[in-house]
Structure formats: C-alpha cells, structure tokens
Amino acid sequence: MNVEAKESSVAPAGDHGGAVQDPADVRDRLELLKNKANGETNGATPNGTKSTNAKDPSRPRRKKARRACFACQRAHLTCGDERPCQRCIKRGLQDACHDGVRKKAKYLHDAPDGALMPGVGGNFYNHPMRHNMPLSSNGANAVNATSQQNSGASFYPTPQSNPYNVYQESTLSQNSFPSQSPVSPTFNMKNTATARSNSLSSSVNQPQSNPAASGPPSQSQNPFAGPFFDPSDPALFNFDLSSMNFENRYGALEFGMLGHMATGAGDSPSESATQRGSIGRSGSAQFATTPITGNPGFGESPGNQQPFMFGNDPLLNEWPNNHPPGQGHMNVGGVYPQNSMMAGHLSKADAPHAFAIESGPASFSSPSATTSPHVNGGYDENALSNAVAHKPNGLPTNGQRPAITTPRLKHQSLQLGVKRRHRNPSTVYESVKEPYAYTNRFHNLTAFIQRRFSSQKTLQIAKALASIRPSFIATTKTLNRDDLIFMEKCFQRTLWEYEDFINACGTPTIVCRRTGEIAAVGKEFSILTGWKKDVLLGKEPNLNVNTGGTSIPQSGTSSRGSFTPRISTLEQANPARPQPVFLAELLDDDSVVDFYEDFARLAFGDSRGSVMTTCKLLKYKTKEDMELAQSDDNQRWNNHLRKGGIAGEAGMNQLGFKDGKVECAYCWTVKRDVFDIPMLIVMNYLIPSDGFKSSIPF
C-alpha cells in the first residue's frame, strides 16, 4: 500500500471522550505515517542521515517526558518536558500548553490536586502558591484556568449557589480564637451576603484592603499567623520517608503513620494535656462564625440557622472566643446553677449518701461518706450560671460569649499520695528466701473442712480436690528447692502488681492462693463483709463465730452447717492462728461446695476461663455481734435500712447483719505460674439488686 492510499484510508476518529479529534492531530498522524513509510522503503533520508524508523537500533532515543501536555495527551502523542513543547509550538498552541491531568490512583482520591503538583509535595498547606490558587468544584486546587467557571459549590446549596472564599481571610472579628488549632486548617467564613456572593476566581484578582490577607501577616495583626497545620508532613511525626523503600510518597506516609501509631499505642497522655483538659494538642478545630446574624455560615444549615456541628446545646455554644491562650481550664461549675436540681436533690437531710469507692487517680483510699456528697469539686464559679439559666441560647445580654474553661486540677492531686508505698519490685526478690509450705496449708484446710462441714458436704469437697491431686503431683514432682523459691517469688511479684489494681478498681475484691488462703483484700470487701484486712491476712486474731447456721440452736437438732464443737483444745486456747483465713470461712456451706467443684474443672483446664455465679458471704461476727443482732435496737436499724436505703459505709457494713449472710454475685478466675500450676485466684464480688436477682441465668 502506498502513502496516498494510507492517507485516504485515515479518517478522523473520536478520542476516548467521544469528541472528534482536531484536524491538526490528524495531520500529525499522517506525517508520522509518511516518515514511517519512507524509512521502511528507502532506509535512509535523501541527505544521507540516519532513518527515523522506530525499529532502527541506531536511531536516537527520545527521552520520555514526566508528564505530557494537555494537547499531546489527547492526541496520544509523545511529548517533552519543556513548556511549551515542540509540538504545541509547531501547531501554534504554545500559549495553551500546560500539563495534562492524570487519573488519580485509588489511594490518592482523598488528596487535593494541588498536593500532587510537582514541587509541592508535603508542603501543600505551607506553599506560597496555595493562597493564589482557585478552587475547583470539588474543593481542590484546579490546574486549569478554564475550570474556574465550574467552581463555587458551597457547603449548603443556596438559591444563588454562591461560592465561599475559604483560604482568603478578611478582617478578624473579636470573637475569633486567639490560638492556632493543629487539628485542621483555620476557616474564617464570612456570613454577610456580600462576602458570600464573591466567587473564588474573582477574589484572587481583586486587591485586598486587609494587609493580613495580601501579605505575610504578623502575629500582632493576625492571631492566626504562623504555618498552617499540614497533616501530610512527615516531619510532624519524626520519621524520614527517604529511608523507606517506597515508590510513592503517600504509601510511605501511610506506612510510617501506622508505625508511629503502633509505637505510641502504650504511651500515656502527658501531664500538660491533662491539666488543659484538651482533646488533641491545643484544642479543637477552630471555626470563626457569627451565629448572631441571620446568614448561615460554615457549618450552618439554611433551614434552621443553627450550627450544624453543635446543634442547640447551650454548653457547647458557650465555647470561649476570647480567653487567654495560656489559660487552659474550663469552668463547668458555672454552667449549671447551684440552686437548681442538684441543690434541691442534696438538700434533704434524710437522703442516703452515695457510697464513694474511689476519689481520684492519685489516691488509692476511699473517701469518707461525709465528703462524698459535696458538690463543689474545685471548680471556678462566676456569673455564667445566671446567663445560662435565663438565656435560652446560653448567650449573655451584650452578645459576647463568656469563657468556659476546663476544671483547674490541683497540683497536689497529680502527685502521689502519702499512703502509697514505694514501688520497688526488687524488695520482693530480696525478701523471699524460703519456699511456701503448701503441703502444711492443705493439711490445715482439710482439718478445717472436717470440723466445719457435715460428712456429706465434706465428701463432695474431698472428691473435687481428689480429682486435681494427680495433676498437682505430676507438675511438682520435678521441681527442686530453687524452683519452689522461684515459684514463691513469682507469686509475690504478681501479688505486688495486683495490689494497686485492687485499690484502684473500687470493686470488692480478694486474691487467694491455690490453698484458699487470703493473700490480698480490698477495702470495699472489708466494708461489705466486716472482715478486717489484718484478720483476713492472719495478722490479728480471728474471733469470728459465724459459720452460716443459726446463732441460737433449735430444740432437738442443730441446723445444717452450724458450728460444731469439734475444735481442738489448743485452738480453743489460742484462737489467733498464725495463718491467713481460708476462703471456705467466708462462704456458706453450699457456696463452698460449688466453689471447689468449679475449681476442680478450672484449675488445670481453660487457662483463660472464668466462673460467674452467686454465693452468700458470711459476715464477721463475734459473740458480742451475735447478741446485738437479737436486740431491738438492731431490729429498728434494719427497718431504717429498708426504708431509707444505704447511708454511707456504715450502711454497707450493716448489710446482712441480721442473718449474717450477704447474697452476692461473683466472678473469679485462676492465674497460673510459669510451671503451669494454679498460682492464685482472683475474685470480684457484686451486690445484685432485686431486679438483677430475678434475671441471673445461673
């Protein structure tokens, strides 16, 4: 086929967009076909130079351009890096030669177009050209000047579809924030009709009367001065993208951010952030709006003229606009009037006090009942309560927003309490010199079970313990003295760590050895049951006579589970035993049997398993307490509790004082040591309400 036939066979074809190609593009294609045909037939040009055949290995290779221009991109022709390119100069399109728009990858859909421009990189928000760029219809920087006519979409469509001037600032109002928020770029929305009618393209070319918008602003002229927050700047998170083997910057930034989040997952919030009471580094995002006017601004709906993000909440509408930047506390005490519902609720003298378990993160002791109902918690109070009480929208009469700050934390509350022990785990390893005598403790437990329970219940407990006895023998037969000492060190080290958890959780909690001996107890458990901590740990004499039966024997026979006088003469003479209290001494008969049956299944079974059931705790009652339980004064006190409810810690201590039992729901689990032997038992107790008792599934 000759060249003329090829020319006649070539017809204008539509491009990918469906439009007919430019005739100049068709001429360029015909010229390319002619050169190719001459190279195939003749092999060389008439002047003796090398052929331009694409398959000729001696042909000089053209360097591939980084990005083709718009005209060459549409024509699918090779372009160059120079602007204007040689093809556009040849066609007379040098004035309109600019880079073509590439299709974004999926992971770059959320990135603005301006951030993908060459030379901008991660400094898009700090780039000087950013203020002079118009916005396209989707809010990103446009690269084509013809796209300015499609821009101007507002956040909420109005009948005129007027655009917003986002990046260009005008004169700041006195209600703006004095500090820069690092959460997002600052938006200063104009709420007047004139400001909202200006388009983005016209606002760039108009001279600005405000020097803060036309030139580099100073700190005194513009409190928003300073670099914009760039969330894509890798220097913000202290990792170098050049050291990562990634072909694209956004992939390396995402990988670095995941690594930054993983390494900082265990960090605790700084003390300065706690004192400020802020979310983030210096506060929330700043949106300077004027909701007093009738025109909706950024974040406002044109229907109800209310802020879209914050709604009608008067507390959030009172966010400060003029408090000093160094002041980081919020005054919440003035928002709600003191003589309103809270003061009316606490003014009753006969109202039951709340049972305060925990007072703060720096104190591990429960506050007294007299200090718990106090309303004043160290908040700064001002005249804001009157403004909020009488204003429906929470605004004062003069239209200025009062400053609400977070509660000022006391400096001494952030320090460690006096009663908190010095945390030095080295003392645990230095103090343990001998292994713990588990064999003797199991013998003492067996003797106590035989004295306390009937023969039938003793047989049930013995069967449960006999089922796990071979496992104990198999796991301990290879252990020598050093292993047993190390086992005790592990127990003491774990217990040393658990004591802080027990004091901080505020739930009645006890920790036992595998023999059932109490090793640690919380204050709330002592309040609930009346058992002192020193008595439970074996540091004080155990004078308890409550075994779960009736205090006065009935005629004929004694009740099941009552105390039987089968105790040795030595123990009668010396009730102060040198060992801690067993768990079986704290539960009634049925609860003890159920516990050991569950313990036999869980001791060497599921290492992460737990048991949740109900039980009856036995109150610590001496002979004097048993006599007091039968008096008329105690009967009147129980009636008072049924009518008025719990009144502080004294009321908690009086639960079950009549019959000596407290019905509880408790959950416990077994923790094993490094030898896979049950090491300790952790128990949490809860007093169920009347509605909760009927819905317990166990």
Curated annotation (Swiss-Prot):
GO terms for biological process: cellular response to starvation; gluconeogenesis. Keywords: Activator, DNA-binding, Gluconeogenesis, Metal-binding, Nucleus, Transcription, Transcription regulation, Zinc. Residues 1-62, 137-229, 264-305, 388-422 are annotated as: Disordered. Its main location: nucleus. Residues 69-97 bind DNA. Residues 24-34 have a biased composition (Basic and acidic residues). GO terms for cellular component: nucleus. PROSITE patterns: ZN2_CY6_FUNGAL_2. One of its GO terms (molecular function) is zinc ion binding. Residues 38-55, 137-223, 269-293 have a biased composition (Polar residues). It is found in: Nucleus. SUPFAM superfamilies: Zn2/Cys6 DNA-binding domain. Belongs to the ERT1/acuK family. Transcription factor which regulates nonfermentable carbon utilization. Activator of gluconeogenetic genes. This is Transcription activator of gluconeogenesis acuK.
